[in-house]
C-alpha cells in the first residue's frame, strides 16, 4: 500500500541541515566554486523561494553523491548547493535517494529535488518534471582488473549486478539476453559482490562507476570498460507541477556553466579527459521545462466531471 511504501522510504531518509557553501565537495584537489551571479538572480521567482530545500542524493556513490558522517561530497552535491544559492535558499537538508524510491520521495513530500544520477526518460517524465540535463554519460561496466570482459556482448553466461529500478537494469533485460542478472537496492551492494568475486561485472552509468574504480581499497582492483553502450542524461527531478522551480533550476545550471563552476565541479569530482569521454566533460544542452498543466478544478472550486 501507499502507507507501507512511505514508511519504507522514511526509514532510509537521514536529513542533516547543511549551509550551502561556495566551495566544491570535500574531496582531494577540490577548488573554489564562485557564487552565482547576482545580476541573473533577480530574474527568479523570488516570492516562491523557500528558506530551506530538501534534496535527495545518493549516499554511497563516490564522486557523485557520498555521505561520510556529516560530510557530503560529489557532483550532485555541488550542483545542489549551487542551485540552492542561486534561487536564494539559505539551507539544504540532504536525504538519501535509493534508486527505486526516487519518485516516491517527491510524491510524499520528503524531497523537493532529486539529484541522484537520475537519467531523464519519457516514462519518468510522465511522473516528475526534469530540469537540465546537467551531465551526459552512458552505461558502462565495472569489472575486476584482470577480467577479460570489455563489452556487453561478452556478458552472456556471466553474472552481472545492477540496481533495482535503474535504466541500466532495463537495458540488460531488454537487449542483452543470456546473462545472469543480480539486482540490488544500492550500487555499493553490487560493488561489494564484485570485490568478493560473487559477480563478474557491475553495470551502471560510467560516470558513477569511475568513482568506484578510483576509490577501490587497493590499486588496480577494479576498472571500468573503455566504451559505453547507451546515452544517459542526468536531470534534476521535482514534482510534476513545479514548473516555476524547473525554470529557476535551469537558469541556475546555465549560470553554473557560464561561470566555469560546472567544469570545475565535473573535473574535481569525476576526473579528467584521460578518464572520461568528451561528452561527459561537455555541458549538455538544457531542455525546455514543460508547460504548466491546466487546473483540474473549476472556478467555483469543484472538480469537473465527464459528460
Feature annotation, model-predicted:
Residues 8-11:
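C-terminal motif of bacterial Sec signal peptides marking the signal peptidase cleavage site
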Residues 13, 77-87, 158, 166, ...:
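Extended ligand-binding regions for polar small-molecule ligands
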Residues 19-117:
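Extracytoplasmic small-molecule ligand-binding "clamshell" domains
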Residues 58, 135-143, 206, 210, ...:
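Periplasmic-binding protein-like
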Residues 81, 92-154:
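Acidic, polar ligand-binding/catalytic clefts
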Residues 92-104, 147, 167, 182-196, ...:
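Short helix-initiation/N-cap motifs at beta->coil->alpha
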Residues 104, 117-126, 174, 200-230:
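A ligand-binding cleft/hinge motif common to bilobed small-molecule-binding domains
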Residues 170-184, 220-223, 253-305:
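Ligand-binding clefts/hinges and TM-proximal coupling segments of bilobed small-molecule sensing domains
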Amino acid at each position: 500500500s501507499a502507507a507501507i511504501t512511505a514508511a519504507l522510504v522514511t526509514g532510509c531518509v537521514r536529513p542533516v541541515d547543511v549551509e550551502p557553501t561556495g566551495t566544491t565537495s570535500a574531496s582531494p584537489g577540490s577548488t573554489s566554486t564562485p557564487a552565482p551571479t547576482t545580476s541573473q538572480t533577480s530574474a527568479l521567482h523570488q516570492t516562491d523561494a523557500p528558506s530551506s530545500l530538501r534534496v535527495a542524493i545518493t549516499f554511497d556513490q563516490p564522486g557523485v553523491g557520498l555521505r561520510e558522517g556529516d560530510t557530503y561530497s560529489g557532483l550532485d552535491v555541488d550542483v545542489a548547493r549551487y542551485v540552492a544559492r542561486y534561487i536564494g535558499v539559505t539551507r539544504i537538508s540532504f536525504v538519501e535517494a535509493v534508486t527505486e524510491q526516487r519518485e516516491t520521495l517527491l510524491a510524499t513530500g520528503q524531497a523537493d529535488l532529486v539529484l541522484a544520477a537520475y537519467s531523464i526518460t519519457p516514462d519518468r517524465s510522465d511522473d516528475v518534471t526534469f530540469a537540465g540535463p546537467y551531465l551526459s554519460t552512458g552505461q558502462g561496466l565495472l569489472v575486476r582488473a584482470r577480467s577479460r570482459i570489455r563489452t556487453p556482448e561478452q556478458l552472456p553466461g556471466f553474472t552481472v549486478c545492477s540496481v533495482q529500478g535503474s535504466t541500466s537494469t532495463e537495458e540488460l533485460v531488454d537487449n542483452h539476453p543470456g546473462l545472469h542478472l543480480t539486482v540490488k537496492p544500492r550500487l555499493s551492494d553490487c560493488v561489494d559482490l564484485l570485490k568478493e568475486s560473487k559477480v563478474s561485472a557491475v553495470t551502471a552509468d560510467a560516470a558513477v562507476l569511475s568513482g568506484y574504480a578510483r576509490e577501490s581499497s587497493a590499486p588496480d582492483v577494479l576498472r571500468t570498460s573503455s566504451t559505453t553502450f547507451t546515452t544517459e542524461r542526468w536531470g534534476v527531478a521535482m514534482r510534476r507541477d513545479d514548473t516555476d522551480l524547473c525554470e529557476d533550476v535551469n537558469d541556475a545550471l546555465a549560470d553554473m556553466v557560464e561561470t566555469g563552476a560546472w567544469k570545475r565541479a565535473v573535473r574535481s569530482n569525476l576526473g579528467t579527459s584521460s578518464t572520461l569521454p568528451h561528452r561527459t566533460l561537455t555541458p549538455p544542452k538544457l531542455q525546455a521545462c514543460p508547460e504548466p498543466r491546466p487546473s483540474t478544478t473549476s472556478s467555483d472550486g469543484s472538480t469537473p466531471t465527464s459528460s
